[in-house]
Amino acid sequence: MAIIMDGKALAVNMQEQLQEKVARLKEKEWIVPGLVVIMVGENPASQVYVRNKERAAKKAGFHSKTVNLSESISEEELIEVIEKYNQNPLFHGILVQLPLPNHINEMRILLAIDPKKDVDGFHPMNTGNLWNGRPQMVPCTPAGIMEILREYNVELEGKTAVIIGRSNIVGKPMAQLLLEKNATVTLTHSRTPHLAKVCNKADVLIVAIGRAKFVTEEFVKEGAVVIDVGINRDEEGKLCGDVDFDQVKEKVSMITPVPGGVGPMTITMLMEQTYQAALRSLKG
């Protein structure tokens, strides 16, 4: 029977530690970490994510603000809003909730965020720092996965890691973080032939494709560690991941559940990176 990797419990523990660090920072340096979340339009899923981030920021003791903007806002107007917070020393983290409306160029918006305040880790400068082995701001989901692997003492050096999904948000940065730990990494995608056969060689399998229960027991080798990034609903409307949990858990050594695995750690790492940005602001 697999060990269930409890991301929710780890997130709670890290959040408690963060509250203590924020209190000390406030007492010693008179600085409160500040996070602004910019929301364009009224996407229901995005609204849920934004509320969760706002709740986590307040719980951590941050100065938190959500800016709600009309879906019809122009690209230039949105950049002006971002620049306002780039210049505001009370805010150490700026997050623009994605996706954006079709008339707005996403990359242009990401480029407008000060890289020092880019707590999502999507700015090309932060991406470059990650690939050069000098990461500061790292996409939060891969960062959270690394914390889970560390918490459960998963050895990565010399191990074979396979990632399903090559997005800029999860797959690609995840590959680099694993390479930094001296794993041998294969990044797969929808055009990868014999996908199950490739995945079956993995000591560590990370799945991020957004297809409910896609990964079955034939994808995993005996004793593998499986990290499920997906959040979907099955035919009965119940939350599930990209991995068929009930089928796979009998074969692997460790696995993250959905919900309660990777998800809670993503928001926790966003808060941690905002705190770290506040610390770096002391150095100018």
UniProtKB/Swiss-Prot annotation:
Quaternary structure, from the entry: Homodimer.
Catalytic activity: (6R)-5,10-methylene-5,6,7,8-tetrahydrofolate + NADP(+) = (6R)-5,10-methenyltetrahydrofolate + NADPH; (6R)-5,10-methenyltetrahydrofolate + H2O = (6R)-10-formyltetrahydrofolate + H(+)
Record Pfam families: THF_DHG_CYH, THF_DHG_CYH_C
Entry protein name: Bifunctional protein FolD
Superkingdom classification of source: Bacteria
Pathway: One-carbon metabolism; tetrahydrofolate interconversion
Extent of the signal sequence: none
Residues that hold NADP(+) according to the record: G165, R166, S167, S190, I231
Entry-linked InterPro entries: Aminoacid_DH-like_N_sf (IPR046346), NAD(P)-bd_dom_sf (IPR036291), THF_DH/CycHdrlase (IPR000672), THF_DH/CycHdrlase_cat_dom (IPR020630), THF_DH/CycHdrlase_CS (IPR020867), THF_DH/CycHdrlase_NAD-bd_dom (IPR020631)
